[in-house]
From Swiss-Prot:
Lineage, broadest ranks: Bacteria, Bacillati, Cyanobacteriota, Cyanophyceae, Oscillatoriophycideae
The name this protein goes by in its record: Small ribosomal subunit protein uS14
Disulfide bonds: none
Family the entry assigns: Belongs to the universal ribosomal protein uS14 family.
GO molecular function: rRNA binding; structural constituent of ribosome
GO cellular component: cytoplasm; small ribosomal subunit
Keywords: Ribonucleoprotein, Ribosomal protein, RNA-binding, rRNA-binding
Family matches, as NCBIfam families: PRK08881.1 (NF006477)
Main function: Binds 16S rRNA, required for the assembly of 30S particles and may also be responsible for determining the conformation of the 16S rRNA at the A site.
One BP term from GO: translation
InterPro entries assigned to the protein according to its UniProt record, in alphabetical order: Ribosomal_uS14, Ribosomal_uS14_bac/plastid, Ribosomal_uS14_CS
Quaternary structure and interacting proteins, as annotated: Part of the 30S ribosomal subunit. Contacts proteins S3 and S10.
């Protein structure tokens, strides 16, 4: 199990990312279309003033049950350990052990 503080920190980042998503994309579009260098500097400064945790690159996928950040399967939203347990118990529809 991951520390609760880490899971809560990740939830806070998700809220911030959602809150500033529109403003960030708007500023990036303005930056892309700006022709003057001073204008680009001003837009870049505005981007820098946004909260650091609102950037999408700060997002870390975590397991829904354990909060584990490593070994994450996007299709299920689970870590490899929980995925294996749940698959053995038959809790994931359509998942079968491979055999060849």
């Amino acid at each position: 199990m991951a520390k609760k503080s880490m899971v809560e920190r990740e939830k806070k980042r998700a809220r911030l990312r959602q809150k500033y998503e529109a403003k960030r994309t708007e500023l990036k579009e303005q930056f892309r279309t700006a022709e003057d260098f001073e204008e680009k500097l001003a837009i870049h400064q505005k981007l820098q003033e946004l909260p650091r945790n609102s950037a999408p690159s700060r997002h870390r996928n975590r397991c829904l049950t354990t909060g584990r950040p490593r070994g994450y399967y996007r299709d299920f939203g689970l870590s490899r350990n929980v995925l294996r347990e749940w698959a053995h118990q038959g809790l994931l529809p359509g998942v079968v052990k491979s055999s060849w």
